[in-house]
Amino acid sequence: MDDLTAQALKDFTARYCDAWHEEHKSWPLSEELYGVPSPCIISTTEDAVYWQPQPFTGEQNVNAVERAFDIVIQPTIHTFYTTQFAGDMHAQFGDIKLTLLQTWSEDDFRRVQENLIGHLVTQKRLKLPPTLFIATLEEELEVISVCNLSGEVCKETLGTRKRTHLASNLAEFLNQLKPLL
């Protein structure tokens, strides 16, 4: 496990939860995750769940993605998706507003790996360098990704070579995120 990335993710999650506590006097609330089982759920309303991050259980790797492509995935991606269970968190990096993706449960972790495989299949078909997404943007065709060759974080337009460098590594990126509520 990449300790710098794990600590940066935990630190951002703490900043996010602290900001939520400050503004709402509660743990984060999600309507999107209502009805989806998770160890993160601490209470439920009639249409939403309150959640708090929990330690990841299970194998701490995305080896299913590696096996599917017979490639080695950046260690930071293994760490990013297996440090904790949590709800997705809204954030800002510079002037970019994003939703930082997280695994909600072991079932969700399997789904995330399937989506990463699908993303890599498309990139391979289009002969694009491999990236692994970590966040979504309001524009549906744009994501925040980690380049699997260099480890740098970029804003990427899906299906194209258009990429904008954001940070040299994932820990640096996470350390610069500001929570958005």
Swiss-Prot record:
Chief localisation class: membrane
Pfam families listed in its UniProt record: Syd
Keywords: Cell inner membrane, Cell membrane, Membrane
InterPro entries cross-referenced by the UniProt entry: Syd, Syd_sf
Any one GO BP annotation for this protein: regulation of protein-containing complex assembly
Annotated Gene Ontology cellular component terms: cytoplasm; cytoplasmic side of plasma membrane
Highest taxon above the source species: Bacteria
Disulfide bonds: none
Subcellular location: Cell inner membrane
Membrane topology term: Peripheral membrane protein
NCBIfam families: PRK04968.1
Family: Belongs to the Syd family.
Summary of the function given for this chain in its UniProt record: Interacts with the SecY protein in vivo. May bind preferentially to an uncomplexed state of SecY, thus functioning either as a chelating agent for excess SecY in the cell or as a regulatory factor that negatively controls the translocase function.
Full protein name: Protein Syd
Organism expressing this protein natively: Escherichia coli (strain K12)
UniProt lineage: Bacteria, Pseudomonadati, Pseudomonadota, Gammaproteobacteria, Enterobacterales
